[in-house]
A protein has these predicted regions:
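Ordered alpha/beta subdomains of enzyme catalytic regions
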Residues: 1-213, 244, 319-464
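Glycine-rich phosphate/ribose-binding loops and adjacent secondary-structure elements
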Residues: 192-367
Length: 464
């Protein structure tokens, strides 16, 4: 498409594209915005190297001729990103059909970065949202991210570790992610460690010698309760040298039953401080079930179903042209029609006002940022008979903030702990009804009345 724009001499036409998704993942009441730092790094460093140009030069069309003109390749060689970018910050709670990112500039540049931006936003937002749901279901327990082995490739595992930490995990077993992103690291030994020694007890003793300050013992290699007895023996040996066993891990079987039996036996032996760690294909629903069964698990090791977004492996964010600047220098709004109402985009360069009342979010209103007149009424895009008005009792904030200005980065990315805290703050302001794992109450997101009327008028005109 970039080549086509260049070929038809409209490549410098000013445009605005918006990123949004049509449905909250996991049937959740919200999503967690994540991936912006990767997008910033990509946009801040995008260029065409000699190697890139040589590869593009080698491509042939079906008739055997060069796919691209030499002049176009020269043009790409001098490429310099020059767009404006506005985005919602990482760690904010977001909702379907809201503009998450606006990219504004020459249409060939906006089009060029589409796939990379969607890729980075989609996956990271999925994982952060999944981690958040697991964190909420654990009711504040420690969650360890154990997903490296099951993640979709090395790059996927690194992104997943970062997004999981933002979403609510406490530590990661991915040491490289710990190094790159300053995430606390933690891990346990595997069954192979136990099998490498003549007995389970010997393996536990040797592990405690190597890791006296970070010792978590996996007790289900042969028999969980026998393994617990061996762990208790090692815990008592550690106490003799003023050390403490951190925990015992159960990776199979009836986790609720076994955790209760283990807790009782540990407490009987004066080891109330030893934590019980559970793993084995956990997700937010199994955590909730185990909580309801009053299991004695206080640390959750989660891998596969977190880092693969197991039950919703694609977010489905889209990137739509919403405005073009005309020869008079004014913006013409653009809209894509569809037989499916959900696929009709909001036209224009849009911003979001998030309203707050009594320390709770009250609703998000999408409005046209080029329109000086903004009403106090928003309309449900799926049912025009439903609306909400925001009076002076509500305060508000604009969600999309400037990231790039004419290609220059003007935003400083916060550290991960700050992003994580931002999410915690947002979740406190989100009513509990929107945070239910199943059948959450819909958070109010609507279109400002003037924008709604204009959108409706555009649809009717195009369908004449």
């Amino acid at each position: 498409m970039c080549y086509g724009y260049w070929k038809k001499n409209i490549h410098l036409k000013e445009s605005n594209f918006s990123v949004f998704f049509r449905k909250n993942p996991f049937n959740s009441g919200y999503a967690v915005c994540c991936g912006l730092e990767f997008i910033i790094d990509y946009l801040n460093n995008i260029k065409f190297t000699d190697s890139d140009i040589n590869y593009l030069k080698s491509l042939k069309s079906d008739d055997g001729n060069n796919l691209f003109d030499k002049e176009f390749l020269k043009f790409l060689k001098s490429f310099k990103f020059s767009c404006d970018v506005e985005a919602i910050e990482e760690g904010r709670v977001i909702f379907s059909n809201e503009p998450i990112i606006n990219i504004r500039g020459p249409i060939y540049q906006c089009q060029l970065v589409e796939s990379a931006i969607i890729n980075m936003f989609n996956f990271n937002t999925l994982i952060a949202t999944k981690a958040s749901r697991m964190s909420l279901s654990s009711k504040g327990d420690t969650i360890l991210e154990f997903g490296l082995r099951r993640a979709q490739g090395i790059d996927g595992s690194l992104s997943a570790s970062r997004a999981s930490y933002i979403g609510g995990t406490s530590k990661t077993s991915n040491v490289l992610a710990g190094k790159l992103f300053d995430i606390p690291v933690s891990g346990t030994h595997s069954h192979s460690w136990v099998l490498a020694f003549d007995s389970e007890l010997e393996s536990f003793k040797k592990y405690a010698e190597v890791m006296p300050n970070n010792c978590i013992l996996l007790i289900d290699t042969f028999n969980t309760m026998d393994g617990l007895d061996n762990a208790i023996f090692v815990a008592k040996e550690l106490e003799k040298i003023n050390k403490k066993l951190l925990g015992v891990r159960i990776d199979s079987g009836d986790l609720a039953y076994l955790s209760k039996k283990a807790r009782a036996k540990l407490d009987k032996n004066g080891l109330e401080y030893v934590k019980i760690v559970a793993s084995n294909d956990l997700d937010e629903f199994l955590i909730k079930s185990l909580k309801n069964q009053k299991s004695k698990i206080s640390v959750w090791g989660i891998g596969t179903k977190l880092v693969t977004a197991y039950d919703n492996p694609s977010l489905g964010a889209v990137y739509k042209l919403t405005a073009l600047k005309n020869s008079d220098g004014n913006w013409d709004k653009k809209i894509k029609l569809s037989e499916q109402k959900i696929k009709i985009n909001n036209p224009g360069i849009n911003q979001i006002l998030r309203f707050k009342k009594k320390e709770l979010f009250g609703g998000d209103m999408i409005y046209d940022s080029t329109n000086e007149k903004i009403g106090d009424k928003m309309i449900d895009p799926n049912d025009s008979t439903r609306f909400k008005k925001f009076n002076k009792k509500y305060s508000y904030e604009k969600l999309l903030i400037k990231i790039f200005e004419k290609g220059k980065l003007i935003y400083k990315c916060p550290d991960l702990k700050s992003i994580k805290q931002r999410l915690e703050d947002d979740l406190l302001m989100l009513d509990n009804s929107h945070k239910r794992l199943e059948n959450p109450h819909s958070y109010p997101v609507g279109i400002e009345e003037n924008l709604y009327k204009e959108k409706k008028k555009m649809i009717l005109n195009l369908r004449k």
